[in-house]
Amino acid sequence: MYFKNIIGQKNIIKQLNLLFENNQVPHSQIFIDRYNSGGLPIALDYSLLLLNNQHKTNLNQKIEIKRNYFEHPDLNFIFPLPGPKNTISEFLSPWFEFLKSKKYHPVEDWLNHIESGNKQGIISVEVIKELNKSLRLKSFSGGKKICIIWGAEKLNELASNKLLKLIEEPPSLTYFLIISKNEKKLLPTLKSRCQVIRIPPTKNEDIKSYYTEVGIENNKQAYLINASMGSSSRAIKLSEDEKNTIKLEEMLIKCLRLSFSAQKT
């Protein structure tokens, strides 16, 4: 059930499963997703694995988590916002929409999704302060709490230092899953407090399997795989473009046939 819809990344998934099975999950991990090849989707499924396997979680809670786990009350999200005065709560609704269909997409697509204009996005110190308050509250299930911080390269200096302090003195049973595309923009001391997992480019054979699964014709796959350049995000976008092109061609053919039939009558 877990990691079922991840494109490739079998070694990363194996590593995470082993950490869980051996009860060695560190309380803070950084996923470097330089190629947009699954950092956020992997973190989401990893959260499901952690939240859905607690001795205090009953069957009904498990079913609910399976259905809509990214809205679980013990799962907290931090993501880039248009400006320092914005709050996470005011963008949760579009965020959940984004997760349903675009979780492989990069930060830039998220900022476009919320129509941020030319703003580059920021994770401010006020956002981390609010996170700190939230994590100090008792968990809904009486067990673990998880925080996914996506687009961590957008943390400003004050926010980075505040997060560092939170990670150094975490609330009990709290886990931080931090995702960043740009490792160089992360605070070195923050990295030193976390287990760093670097997500490699998605293998061509895994992208090919994905294209076959979504119905891309074999004779078009090689070009699209090369154009994907190891990025799952780019591979998905290219498949969507290809499907849209096919639909347009089908509509054009249908219109031409209707026009031809009308001329005959």
Regions found by a protein language model. Name each.
Residues 1-69, 172-175, 181-265:
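Charged, glycine-rich active-site and insertion segments that engage polyanionic ligands
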Residues 2-154, 158:
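Clamp-loader machinery-focused feature within the broader ASCE/P-loop NTPase space
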Residues 133, 165, 192:
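Conserved adenine-binding aromatic site and its adjacent loop/helix in ATP-hydrolyzing domains
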Residues 136, 161-172:
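Conserved catalytic/switch belt of AAA+ P-loop NTPases
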Residues 141-146, 171-177:
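Loop/turn-to-beta-strand initiation segments
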Residues 154, 169, 185:
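Residues immediately C-terminal
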